[in-house]
A protein has these predicted regions:
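Mobile active-site "lid"/loop adjacent to the S-adenosyl-L-methionine
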Residues: 219-250
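Conserved AdoMet
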Residues: 2, 34-35, 39-118
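Conserved SAM/SAH cofactor-binding pocket of Class I
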Residues: 109-227
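Helix-to-beta-strand junctions that scaffold the AdoMet/dcAdoMet cofactor pocket
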Residues: 181, 236, 262-264
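Non-catalytic nucleic-acid substrate-recognition regions in nucleic-acid-modifying enzymes
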Residues: 1-33
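Class I S-adenosylmethionine-dependent transferase superfamily signal
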Residues: 115, 150, 232, 254-258
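Conserved Class I SAM-dependent methyltransferase catalytic core
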Residues: 245-308
Length: 311
């Protein structure tokens, strides 16, 4: 690692700052270097992308220049861009992100798509189903992105969102408040879904009263840790990454809890790891589940398993 702040020129324009930032990140083989440099410059300037490209000759003042290249050096050392800016977009919404939560990924948006489709509340924003008072659970909520996106799409839904991490729940609560859905989400500290039955009683719901249980559980195997990108392995919370030695161990207890929580006809939606589709399909072959489906993401990778609870 040889990253360091470059010599400060007398003046530095927006376009020159981007050029120099990209070059420094590329020297350290940072993925998506141009995007990272853009986001960090936007953050340092307090401006959006449109402003940056509309003002390429704008000169950075010394304090902004110093902050920007400090951020570039931190990103070059492996710190995720989202931890430096404190933000990540998900489902068109801006989420606060800290090292206490998994950074929301674009592929997790497929969980929202499948959930809405399985509930009959899909792409038509005017669908009467979107006004139904759905009862939902988001297990392992992290930043709250799944629960908050669902609450944003379904204005009468009420959601119980769980996480083992008190620090993650604090981030999720702030995100819920940011998006004006805090009154419809109960945040509960517990491991996976093990305490969700108790949580449902404490928030006034009966067991088997949920219309949906959604989760992006930790599904990476411990044996895969060394192969993860440095920014993931060193900077994201282990409890949100690893689901056991193989990464598939997390699904059996989660599916068992879902069977106890979902009402007849209720829907289970789970994000899948790269090697977990066959294992999850096998678990959902058990009595009690019907309409089992695997949905691929845009890259053609099995990404989401869904099923319906029968009587």
């Amino acid at each position: 690692m040889t990253s360091r702040l470059p010599p400060s020129p007398a003046t530095l324009s927006v376009v020159a700052a981007l050029r120099d930032g990209i070059a420094q990140l590329e020297r350290e083989y940072v993925p998506s270097a141009a995007l990272a440099a853009e986001l960090l410059l936007m953050h340092a300037l307090g401006r959006d992308r449109a402003w940056i490209y509309a003002h390429p000759e704008h000169e950075l003042n010394p304090a902004t220049r110093e902050q920007y290249f400090f951020l570039i050096a931190r990103r070059a050392s492996g710190v995720p861009t989202q931890h430096l800016t404190g933000h990540q977009e998900f489902w068109g919404l801006d989420f606060e992100v800290t090292p206490d939560v998994l950074i929301p990924r674009p592929e997790t948006e497929h969980v929202i798509e499948v959930a809405l489709e399985r509930l009959g509340a899909g792409s038509d924003a005017g669908s009467p189903r979107r006004k139904k008072e759905f009862r939902m659970a988001d297990v392992g909520t992290g930043s709250g992105c799944i629960a908050i996106a669902l609450a944003h799409e379904l204005p009468s839904a009420h959601i119980v969102a769980t996480d083992i991490s008190p620090a993650a729940l604090e981030v999720a609560r702030r995100n819920a408040a940011r998006h004006n859905v805090a009154s419809r989400i109960d945040f509960v500290e517990c491991h996976l879904a093990d305490s969700l039955l108790h949580a449902s009683r404490s928030t006034g719901h009966e067991s088997r009263s949920f219309d949906l249980l959604a989760s992006n559980p930790p599904y990476i195997g411990r044996h895969e840790a060394a192969s993860l990108p440095r920014e993931v392995r060193e900077h994201e919370p282990e409890t949100a990454l690893y689901g056991g030695e193989t990464g598939t161990e997390i699904y059996a207890p989660l599916i068992a809890q879902a069977a106890a929580l979902l009402k007849p006809g209720g829907v289970l939606v789970l994000e899948l790891g790269h090697n977990s589709a066959e294992h999850v399909l096998h678990l959902l072959e058990a009595p009690g589940w019907t309409s089992v489906a695997i949905s691929n993401d845009l890259a053609g990778i099995p990404r989401v398993a869904s099923a319906q609870r029968n009587a």
